[in-house]
Amino acid sequence: KRLKAVAVQGDMEVPTAVGPELMKALRKKHVGALSGHWRQLHETGTPGIYDMCCSMDDAPTKNYKGVAEFDSPNYADCRGEIVLEKQKRRYGCWRCPIACGGIMKAGNGDYVYDEGAHKPEYETMAMFGSNLCNDNLESLIVVSDLCNRLGVDTISAGASMAFLMECFEHGILTAADNDGLEMKWGDHRAIV
């Protein structure tokens, strides 16, 4: 009952319920699925759907009370193609046939950061981007990297930040309650 781990080593083949012919057919089918829509996801990763979701009002905006077209009109500044311009190299997660991950180049614009940050995923971009009316891509890369390194879930953190901004918007909280920091929609410096 207090088993902590099991380590197995060897070179015996592990039998499967399906034969090698079926495995080859399944592999071919899954690799073929990478064409078309899957190819787009492979190329850009989940940031490739960010601007589409914003344009269709499917991405959260202003704590789910706004519309990206009006409240975050420059959301296209964070579209997948622009994210790729800041990407150094690609990688794939283990056993994932899409392999959409990316390692970012060093940042030298509004935010200076070291090379090696992971490409932000759609959920991070939506929760810290359109949800907070933030169209600064480098801030999204920095926030994504900070959350990853600290073990913080970006969806929950972005939602909490939106609630905080809404409290400021309605006068429930002020800068005096927040160590002098004013929180306004779209203020990427306050977000970071």
Question: Where do the model's predicted regions map?
Answer:
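Intrinsically disordered, low-complexity segments enriched in small residues
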Residues: 1-192
